């Protein structure tokens, strides 16, 4: 099997296309709920996980399996599981590790939806999220205890764009027998970063973003590195070392070895909680994967050019992008990111003279710049082929209090830009006309 990313994104999971019933070169859409057993014995064997095959599409589907194998290959993982959304991927990834009374340790530099999920929803499940402000490896270790079941990071923090020191954090976590879970959404399916290469144990994605790439489909992925030694920690992770109450006494460590985790998540959590990815979504995401490297390359190139242009603009007070030497995590970005520095940046606009921003916060120059863009779309997504903008303080992080917003790196003047693959001069021209419209001849 070819190993280059550009080839893997086209062929992994479908190395022998002639194997399907009608020799279709495109991945077929298996729009079926269920699969016919050869006989009763065969059905029994499938339900007992004694032979490979398909039972019911809430557990497994041939179209989705191609997507799973392809993303696992691109990430350098052993296996993957496709689910209904990025939030579902995070939920199952953590619930496969932590139970009532357990805790996870996470950076505070998070997407607002993740922060809220960890802080509120996981608490209802009896799982405590302990937030470390920033990504200093030593700060994580300070809050570990015997019930810590995972460390959680984002490859490129949203919206601060910090790049954690993976190797140091992984070393500290593994010293305590704790697996590391990394949301690699901003790593674009492994194009900008492969966290498993640096020791991460489990990778999650909102496949909605760069993997799909066209703003058409919601989906999530969990990738298992297959490298964490679950057998070495039977008391810490009894769900793998003891007979499974929910699957006729199966001991996952014995039955599935290095794949114990991902099989457990599929056969029990996906089965019981139900956030499956439907085959139509898998098919659409596969269309995106086939051009992933081509799009991601352009996203990265355009983002760097726009960031450098914004740095020189008289209307801009600051720019945050890990590809800039001025960024606090630039050295980590150079170490851990490849093929570019990602497709998203943030910046702040200088104050508008005489704006009544205390009475009406939407009079802030940043909000007005967003409202006056014509090419870029003001919406809550990233990773689309088209340029997208948003003011996170008023939207994606709105549910956080002011202290939590600051801890996440969100300020009132922040504009987040998911840079598209349009011609860069057109993107720049759109921001320039918006600046000129908002300031209308006034000096910033």
UniProtKB/Swiss-Prot annotation:
Domain of life according to the entry: Eukaryota
Entry EC number(s): 2.5.1.47, 2.5.1.49
Descriptive protein name: Homocysteine/cysteine synthase
Catalytic activity as recorded in UniProt: O-acetyl-L-homoserine + methanethiol = L-methionine + acetate + H(+); O-acetyl-L-homoserine + hydrogen sulfide = L-homocysteine + acetate; O-acetyl-L-serine + hydrogen sulfide = L-cysteine + acetate
Modified residues (N6-(pyridoxal phosphate)lysine): 209
Gene Ontology terms: cellular component: cytoplasm; plasma membrane
Keywords for this protein: Amino-acid biosynthesis, Cytoplasm, Isopeptide bond, Methionine biosynthesis, Phosphoprotein, Pyridoxal phosphate, Transferase, Ubl conjugation
């Amino acid at each position: 099997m070819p190993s280059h990313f550009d080839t893997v994104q086209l062929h992994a999971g479908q190395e022998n296309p002639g194997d399907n019933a009608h020799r279709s070169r495109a991945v077929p859409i298996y729009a079926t709920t269920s699969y016919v057993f050869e006989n009763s014995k065969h059905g029994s064997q499938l339900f007992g996980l004694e032979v490979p095959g398909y039972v019911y599409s809430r557990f497994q589907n041939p179209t989705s399996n191609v997507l799973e194998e392809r993303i696992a290959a691109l990430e350098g993982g052993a296996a993957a599981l496709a689910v209904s959304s990025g939030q579902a991927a995070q939920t199952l990834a953590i619930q496969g590790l932590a139970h009532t009374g357990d805790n996870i340790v996470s950076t505070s530099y998070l997407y607002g939806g993740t922060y809220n999920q960890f802080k509120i929803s996981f608490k209802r499940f009896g799982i405590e999220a302990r937030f470390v402000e920033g990504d200093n490896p030593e700060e994580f270790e300070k809050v570990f205890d015997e019930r810590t079941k995972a460390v959680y990071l984002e490859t490129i923090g949203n919206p601060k764009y910090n790049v954690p020191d993976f190797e140091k954090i992984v070393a500290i976590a593994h010293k305590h027998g704790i697996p590391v879970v990394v949301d690699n959404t901003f790593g674009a399916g492994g194009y900008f970063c492969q966290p498993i290469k640096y020791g991460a144990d489990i990778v999650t994605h909102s496949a909605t973003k760069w993997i799909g790439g066209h703003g058409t489909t919601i989906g999530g992925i969990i990738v298992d590195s297959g490298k964490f030694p679950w057998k070495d920690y039977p008391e810490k992770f009894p769900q793998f070392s003891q007979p499974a109450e929910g699957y006729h006494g199966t001991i996952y460590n014995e039955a599935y070895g290095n794949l114990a985790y991902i099989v457990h998540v599929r056969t029990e959590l996906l089965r019981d909680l139900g956030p499956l990815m439907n085959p139509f979504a898998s098919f659409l995401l596969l269309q995106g994967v086939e051009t992933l490297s081509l799009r991601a390359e352009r996203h990265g190139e355009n983002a760097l050019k726009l960031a450098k242009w914004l740095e020189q603009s008289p209307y801009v007070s600051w720019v945050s992008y890990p590809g800039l030497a001025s960024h606090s995590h630039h050295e980590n970005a150079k170490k851990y990111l490849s093929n570019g520095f990602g497709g998203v940046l943030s910046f702040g606009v200088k104050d508008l003279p005489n704006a009544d921003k205390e009475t009406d916060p939407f009079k802030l120059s940043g909000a007005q710049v967003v409202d006056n863009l014509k090419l870029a779309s003001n919406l809550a997504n990233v990773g689309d082929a088209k340029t997208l903008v948003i003011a996170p303080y008023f939207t994606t992080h709105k549910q956080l209090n002011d202290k939590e917003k600051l801890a996440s790196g969100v300020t009132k003047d922040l504009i987040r830009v998911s840079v598209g693959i349009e011609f860069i001069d057109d993107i720049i021209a759109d921001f320039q006309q918006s600046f000129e419209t908002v300031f209308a001849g006034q000096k910033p």
